Amino acid sequence: MPETKSSVSTLEQPETKPKKVGFVSLGCPKNLVDSEVMMGLLATNGAEITARAEDADIIVVNTCSFIDTAKQESVDTILEMAGHKATGRAQKLIVAGCLVERYRNEIQKNIPEVDAVVGTGELEAILAASGIEPRKSEANSPFVILNSTSASQQLKSGIADRPEGAAREEAGRFARTDWDGAVADLPNYLYDENTPRVLATPKYMAYIKVAEGCDHPCSFCIIPQLRGKFRSRRFESVVAEAERLAKQGVKEITLIGQDTTCYGEDLGLKDGLAQLLERLAQIEELQWVRFLYAYPNKITKRLLQTIADNPKIPKYMDVPLQHSAANVLKRMKRGAHGDIFLKSIEEMRRVIPDLTLRTSFIVGFPGETEEDFNQLCEFVKAAQIDWLGVFSYSDEEGAKAFALDEKVPPREIERRRKKLMSLQKQISKKKRKALIGREFDVILEGPSEETDLLWEGRTAMHAPEIDGKVYINDFAEHENVEPGQVFRCEITEAHDYDLVARLL
């Protein structure tokens, strides 16, 4: 009789040696924080975390399923890690994250190498899934930092009872009743300052998730079903976590959430994000406190003024606009249009003269006509945005847009994506050239991946991992420099997305 697989499995007998657990974390920084929480839970209960899958007794793949390419990468990675059960020492393969919320039964049925699954709302179940007994933590701090930057880079590059509360019978954007294996409950897990984390980022920076879930009705998105309703962490909890991180040597904190500009609304806070930024900027040890993912109509005057007035808050905003044509935005259930966005951008730049603006657009959304796309191109020319990402529309079953007609052919979607990226490349090149001769603080990230003769870093204009780099070539071999140090530099060269600088 074949063995029946459950979403949480336990070992019959405990092992005397600590189990080595390897993690592969895919997707966005929000997913990375989930991985850090699961690693923290494992580490404080006796497991040893490794970045080398070939050395692991247990392998965990934390998946993304936001778009088709992310789903495919997740499946490919699961299959790759499954090979370690056949050829290496790995005894158990656990799949976690968004893919589990969407395809729980299918994963267990079609990938027999998978021993357990852990959804986004049940991170604490990673202990039972790994066969590790909970024990009282003896650590004074809930944070552990991986021993080396290279180890954290390897981690990110790919190597019971559900704690979700009472069942919710939601319709519309929260409906999960037709999902394969999805439980009736929406995820409602939210970590706090006492939750252990193993930081997978370099020791000088960290992400803090200030909220989870999303209430926006965007028709192309299934995040509300994957992550649940929007819910903010307590103000004091975020501050306590930031203070503890700063005492451990973290210099740059990035606040993240599906929509950080909604932070605190569910707690009754007005301008919650602005208040939080103001408070965190008072932490002496921190160099920068930035945030990502601002919803366009949630940006307040106080938030803009807070960014403008505080030197510790980078003059940088990531505001995903998704499109500029009113017709497309209406079908996306986003509202507004290009003229409104241009006025908003004008106001942002008036209050914050040196603002660096990042946004993202979706091309090929159902019903996007050639005229709509041309409007988007004209908007990009007019807005002169600093950093821009372009995504090809991905038809996601479960999203409202899945049922829309007037689908754009894949070849046409790709043509539009390339055209818009080509247009933005010229804008980016011009904006980078305008920086030559200007001086900036640069936080060092380490020797360049291209050559040991160069060091690479970021200015406040560069968010971690998503924007360009600053290359510095005048460090003497004998100089004792370390990642995380900040140097004043002058920009000497500009390329399409990257800069070259010299020390001052």
From Swiss-Prot:
Residues 433-504 form the TRAM domain. Its cofactor is [4Fe-4S] cluster. It comes from the Bacteria. It is found in: Cytoplasm. [4Fe-4S] cluster 2 binds at residues 214, 218, 221. SUPFAM superfamilies: Radical SAM enzymes. Residues 19-135 form the MTTase N-terminal domain. It holds the Pfam family Radical_SAM. Residues 200-430 form the Radical SAM core domain. One of its GO terms (cellular component) is cytosol. One of its GO terms (molecular function) is aspartic acid methylthiotransferase activity. GO terms for biological process: tRNA modification. It catalyses: L-aspartate(89)-[ribosomal protein uS12]-hydrogen + (sulfur carrier)-SH + AH2 + 2 S-adenosyl-L-methionine = 3-methylsulfanyl-L-aspartate(89)-[ribosomal protein uS12]-hydrogen + (sulfur carrier)-H + 5'-deoxyadenosine + L-methionine + A + S-adenosyl-L-homocysteine + 2 H(+). InterPro entries: Elp3/MiaA/NifB-like_rSAM, Methylthiotransferase, Methylthiotransferase_CS, Methylthiotransferase_N, Methylthiotransferase_N_sf, NA-bd_OB-fold, Ribosomal_uS12_MeSTrfase_RimO, rSAM. It is an enzyme of class 2 (transferase). Its EC number is 2.8.4.4. Keywords: 4Fe-4S, Cytoplasm, Iron, Iron-sulfur, Metal-binding, S-adenosyl-L-methionine, Transferase. Binds 2 [4Fe-4S] clusters. One cluster is coordinated with 3 cysteines and an exchangeable S-adenosyl-L-methionine. SMART domains: Elp3. Belongs to the methylthiotransferase family. RimO subfamily. Catalyzes the methylthiolation of an aspartic acid residue of ribosomal protein uS12. NCBIfam families: 30S ribosomal protein S12 methylthiotransferase RimO, MiaB/RimO family radical SAM methylthiotransferase. This is Ribosomal protein uS12 methylthiotransferase RimO. The gene is rimO.
